[in-house]
């Protein structure tokens, strides 16, 4: 991977509320910002911006609420129309929580969607007119691949593309970037079998390269009123490939996931009494 410093270039673009030509907008925005894509660059595109370009915007008032959604919405203090959409969009719903936010009780469902564990199946109500919600792109990996192909056709450059989104790390406050989809380079670098500095063979380490690049891009793209749904990440050192990627290239079975596997097992087997507070009479450093 790269040893030279990374460069991250923010690219502002027009605010969109309905379906539009994403490829033309990207090219026009690059020109307006004086930014140039180079071969080997990675273009980060907000998954929400891509979804809006596909018309993936829903008026909540148009969503018919099922009895199941109404029950869950009441239990977790959620908008019933939003709850219905979550149930329709999620690949799996693990459960939900409610908590107080500035004196208001609010709730969320924890879901699995497109290989990502996230609240409310990734549905986004920010930076969109009130009463509307933005879904994920209909098919994220082909969307990323199409952006890559269009940039190659229109600008003559071979690049990588990531669709960026935000997620929450378990037990941590604050959102971070995650790559919803990748095109043009392997999103995960397998380090298993390699030798570390002390001669130890790596047994389980696989580096989330696409996610790491996404985090860099999110630093300049922002989350609120920045109007920067695009970013160029330069000198990542990724090797470009033409393979069609899918969620299978980044996801793992739930039983292999340290979070899902452990928490699911923990519902049946409480190991807390077996966990020592001290080791050999001394606090563990």
Identify the residue ranges that each predicted region occupies:
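N-terminal and secondary-structure boundary signal
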Residues: 1-285
């Amino acid at each position: 991977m790269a040893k030279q410093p990374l460069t991250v270039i923010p690219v502002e673009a027009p605010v969109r509320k309905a379906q539009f030509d994403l490829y033309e907008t990207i090219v026009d925005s690059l020109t307006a910002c004086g930014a140039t894509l180079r071969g080997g660059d990675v273009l980060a595109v907000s998954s929400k911006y891509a979804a809006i370009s596909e018309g993936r915007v829903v008026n909540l008032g148009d969503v018919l609420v099922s009895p199941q959604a109404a029950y869950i919405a009441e239990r977790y203090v959620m908008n019933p129309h939003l709850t219905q959409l979550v149930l329709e969009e999620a690949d799996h719903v693990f459960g939900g929580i409610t908590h107080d936010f500035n004196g208001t009780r609010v709730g969320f469902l924890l879901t699995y969607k497109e290989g990502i564990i996230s609240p409310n199946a990734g549905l986004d109500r920010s930076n969109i007119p009130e009463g509307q919600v933005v879904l994920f792109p209909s098919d994220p990996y082909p969307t990323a691949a199409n952006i890559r192909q269009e940039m190659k056709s229109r600008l003559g450059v071979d690049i990588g593309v990531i669709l960026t989104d935000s997620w929450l790390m378990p037990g941590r406050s604050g959102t971070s970037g995650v790559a919803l989809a990748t095109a043009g380079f392997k999103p995960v670098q397998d380090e298993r079998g390699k030798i570390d500095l002390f001669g130890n063979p790596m047994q389980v380490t696989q580096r989330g390269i696409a996610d790491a690049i996404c985090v860099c891009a999110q630093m300049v793209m922002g989350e609120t009123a920045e109007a920067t749904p695009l970013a160029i990440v330069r000198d990542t050192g990724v090797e470009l490939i033409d393979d069609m990627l899918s969620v299978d290239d980044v996801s793992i079975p739930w039983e292999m996931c340290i979070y899902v596997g452990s928490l699911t097992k923990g519902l049946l087997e409480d190991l807390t009494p077996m966990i020592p507070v001290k080791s050999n009479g001394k606090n563990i450093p």
